[in-house]
Amino acid sequence: MAVFFRALKACYEATGDERIPAALEKHFLSYPPQDRNSVRWIINVEGILWTYAITGNEALLQLAESEWLRSNSALTQENCLDDNNFNMHGVTMNEELKVPVLLYAYTGKPQYLQAALKADKKMEDANMLVDGVVSSSEYLAGQDALASHETCDITDYSWTMGYFLMATGDASWADRIERCMFNAAP
């Protein structure tokens, strides 16, 4: 659903069809709690927050925050802030890294920005390759000369850096996107 949301978002932006945010609102608010336990469910926070921005329904904002704080995903508020390196699927890392910075953008709560910035630093310090994308041959793979990454890491990393740019207004995030796209994109 998280990636499908992007297609719906694009359709809404092109057409203004109000049925789209209404359907997403209904979907997210009626999604059974027992079905929100998959590791990658947390990526849906992107769509939940976008839908909140369109509808103004505070229940969506509350859902996004509560899902992040109770998440059983590999990236959590707690491990974003600790000093341990991440050992997780690289594409999932690139996708989930946007969640705390999006929560900061929508709530203004500094603890989310702090988590996002520290998680990004930890990820990049241990895994950034010369072409501007973190290594990931399935899992984060360090900075070995033979380390590589998958094509989906390129798109997911640049997409997430776009949210860092929007949330902070700091142009260094645009530099990261440019480096990634000019050096690593096919």
Which residues fall in each region the model found?
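Glycan-recognition and catalytic cores of secretory/periplasmic carbohydrate-active enzymes
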Residues: M1-P186
